[in-house]
Regions:
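A conserved acidic beta->alpha catalytic loop
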Residues: 28, 40-52, 63, 87
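Short beta-strand/loop segment that forms part of the nucleotide-sugar
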Residues: 13, 34-42, 59, 88
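Short aromatic/hydrophobic "clamp" motif used to bind/position activated sugar donors
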Residues: 83
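Catalytic-site signature of metal-activated, phosphate-bearing donor transferases
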Residues: 8, 68-76, 92-221, 225, ...
């Protein structure tokens, strides 16, 4: 399939009560597409009016309890040769000019890089802040591709998936937005689980939902079961492992987390995120086992964060957090060295 002036490229959104962010999203993508298609599922704020003011073709539908159904209805309405799928709390940071160029050639699915920002403190002993997590998500679809799944829906297609040099920002994980969405997806996830009880991706998403509500013990159960059946080549296995290790630590199971990290180390030799979390786990152990802190745990923390700096940033890794291969690791090392120095002087 080639793309030319007669080929339509549409930005396709499903929305509900997104007045806070809809204009920003549509204004960022408008210059790069032929059509803005918005399907509203029951907004009670000014979302519809703002979308129309931004030039969108707005349609309305009742919410039927499935994100896949809504996505597919929006794709039917768009009727475009290529579809860029966006959420209202996202906006293009860079690469908009690459969209149309990428669509030249044979049909395939495009994965774009989504930078999700957080306010949350990742409550490890190092008080780790997660400012930006990177995810490569399939969002650019040729005509005919449709979604499956009530929640955390996925496009289903035998076509190959390739990365597009398109970068989105996403602020839907900021605390103020998460509080509004608390528990919104849980019921849908549980329904999906009854139909697909062994699906590792559903288990992973349930764990993330529980982690977001600080239910760390429950999250560990779902992460553990997800990890058992997640293939080594699954692109989201990296993020799954990091979330699982973090929740084990928060559940007071740092020793168990370190054993798991040891078993998984060969799979992620070049992940700064993996070694950053290992450093945090070692610091947790130093606090819970002070007798061996100087001899064992603090040196392990230091060498782990040094490894992060040696690897550098890896934005190509699913679930990678910006800074773990640079300033966040350096900060932890600086704090550790200053505190260790004080401890040695006092001895």
């Amino acid at each position: 399939m080639s793309i030319n002036k007669a080929t339509q490229l549409a930005a396709v959104l499903i929305v509900r009560d997104e007045a806070r962010s809809i204009s920003r999203c549509l204004q960022s993508v408008g210059p790069w597409v032929d059509r803005l298609l918005v399907l509203d599922t029951g907004s009670t704020d000014t979302t519809v009016e703002l979308a129309r003011a931004a030039g969108a073709d707005v349609h309305k539908t009742a919410w039927l309890g499935s994100f896949a159904l809504a996505r597919n209805q929006a794709l039917d309405l768009a009727n475009a040769d290529w579809n860029l799928i966006l959420d209202a709390d996202e906006w293009i940071e860079s690469g908009g000019e690459q969209i149309r160029l990428w669509c030249v050639g044979s049909p395939r699915l495009g994965k774009v890089c989504v930078h999700s920002s957080y306010d949350r403190v990742g409550a490890s002993a190092a008080n780790e802040i997660m400012p930006t997590e990177l995810s490569w998500i399939t969002r650019l679809l040729p005509r005919g591709v449709r979604y499956e799944g009530r929640v955390h829906e996925q496009p289903v297609s035998p076509l190959p998936r390739e990365r597009v040099p398109l970068y989105l920002n996403h602020d839907g994980y900021r605390d103020a937005q998460l509080n509004k969405k608390q528990g919104r997806n849980r019921e849908l996830l549980l329904l999906e689980l009854t139909e697909r009880p062994s699906d590792p991706y559903i288990l992973y998403q349930l764990g993330k939902d529980e982690e977001g509500r600080s239910e760390f013990a429950a999250a560990c159960v779902h992460y553990q079961n997800a990890l058992k059946t997640t293939g080594r080549n699954a692109n989201w296995r990296h993020g799954l492992l990091l979330h699982y290790l973090h929740c084990l630590s928060r559940a007071g199971r740092s020793g168990e987390a370190l054993k798991l990290a040891g078993a998984e180390m060969e799979a992620f030799p070049d992940s700064p995120d993996f070694y950053f979390v290992v450093g945090n786990l070692a610091l947790d152990q130093a606090i819970s086992d002070p007798e061996h802190a100087i001899s064992d745990w603090l040196p392990l923390a230091a060498v782990s964060w040094e490894r992060c700096l040696a690897i550098g940033e890896r934005p190509d890794l699913e679930g990678s957090v910006h800074g773990r291969g640079s300033h966040l690791a350096q900060h932890n090392l600086d704090v550790l060295r200053s505190q260790t120095g004080l401890a040695l002087v006092r001895k």
